[in-house]
């Protein structure tokens, strides 16, 4: 699973996931399912915010390419992926500036158009069950919840899906692709079932060629959202090095 994750996701997402796990004393090499889940969640958060801006009139627009000098503001503030201290600093700043209620738990995003925090969920189970778990934990009507599944289902607070259908379809397609790639390599069952995960871990430890059969191509396109995060946690030289550090399987 670890090798699959390192080839399936952008290196910067992988590093953010590793930092998040280490912050809680977790090892990506041991808790590989959690590693995969965190990388997936990070990517969904970044895809959620990609290309969405607010123009000078305060209208929400989608811009995939255009005039870099245009007066545009990112519609979403990304909170997920930052260390806890920085994340709470961002949340406090937003609350002080906008007057919105401070959440009890760190949310994933802030929507400047709707003036609300957003909690993003990615589940391997039924969306409505995971939605209720999130809602019971957060216990706040102020934080908007949006849940995606690997089967293309989604659920959001008051059926308000925030994004346009095409943007959500990109997220769903990516999740479905991840599921199919895992399934084709016999990793999906262990990703869903903790018992199967333990069995798979023992099998992986005995394997002499953990890379065999894994994809060697990864998208080199850096998410616009990731670009906005880069200055806060790495310099340009380190970023360039990470982009070039895609894991390659050893040749026989």
From Swiss-Prot:
- Which InterPro entries would you find in this protein's record? PA/PA-X, PA/PA-X_sf
Q: Which UniProt keywords apply?
A: Decay of host mRNAs by virus, Eukaryotic host gene expression shutoff by virus, Host cytoplasm, Host gene expression shutoff by virus, Host mRNA suppression by virus, Host nucleus, Host-virus interaction
Q: Where is this site: Important for efficient shutoff activity?
A: 202-203, 206
Site described as Important for efficient shutoff activity and nuclear localization, located at 195, 198-199
- Which Pfam families is this protein grouped with? Flu_PA
Coiled coil region boundaries: none
A Gene Ontology molecular-function term?
A: RNA binding
Active-site residue list: 80, 108
Where does this chain mainly localize? host cell
Q: Domain text from the record?
A: The probable endonuclease active site in the N-terminus and the basic amino acid cluster in the C-terminus are important for the shutoff activity. The C-terminus acts as a nuclear localization signal. The C-terminus is recruited to host protein complexes involved in nuclear Pol II RNA processing.
Question: Briefly, what is this protein's role?
Answer: Plays a major role in the shutoff of the host protein expression by cleaving mRNAs probably via an endonuclease activity. This host shutoff allows the virus to escape from the host antiviral response. Hijacks host RNA splicing machinery to selectively target host RNAs containing introns for destruction. This may explain the preferential degradation of RNAs that have undergone co- or post-transcriptional processing.
Family stated for the protein in its record: Belongs to the influenza viruses PA-X family.
Name the chain's protein: Protein PA-X
**From which source organism is this entry?**
Influenza A virus (strain A/Duck/Czechoslovakia/1956 H4N6)
Gene that encodes it:
PA
């Amino acid at each position: 699973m670890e090798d699959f994750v390192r080839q399936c996701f952008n290196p910067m997402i992988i590093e953010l996931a590793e930092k998040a796990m280490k912050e809680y004393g977790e090892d990506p090499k041991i808790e590989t399912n959690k590693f995969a889940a965190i990388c997936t969640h990070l990517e969904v958060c970044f895809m959620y915010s990609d290309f969405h801006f607010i123009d000078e009139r305060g209208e929400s627009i989608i811009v995939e390419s255009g005039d870099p000098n245009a007066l545009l503001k990112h519609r979403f503030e990304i909170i997920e992926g930052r260390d806890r201290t920085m994340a709470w600093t961002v949340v406090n700043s937003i609350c002080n500036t906008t007057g919105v209620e401070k959440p009890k738990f760190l949310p994933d995003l802030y929507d400047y158009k709707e003036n609300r925090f957003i909690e993003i969920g990615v589940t391997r189970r039924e969306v409505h069950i995971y939605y209720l778990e999130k809602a019971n934990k957060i216990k706040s009507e102020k934080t908007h919840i949006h849940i995606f599944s690997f089967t293309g289902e989604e659920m959001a607070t008051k059926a308000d899906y925030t994004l346009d259908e095409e943007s959500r379809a990109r997220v769903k397609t990516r999740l479905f692709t991840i599921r199919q790639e895992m399934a084709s390599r016999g990793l999906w069952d262990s990703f869903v079932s903790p018992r199967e995960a333990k069995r798979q871990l023992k099998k992986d430890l005995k394997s002499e060629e953990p890379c065999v059969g894994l994809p060697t191509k990864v998208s080199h396109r850096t998410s616009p959202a990731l670009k906005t995060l880069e200055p806060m946690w790495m310099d340009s030289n380190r970023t360039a090095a990470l982009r070039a550090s895609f894991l390659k399987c050893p040749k026989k």
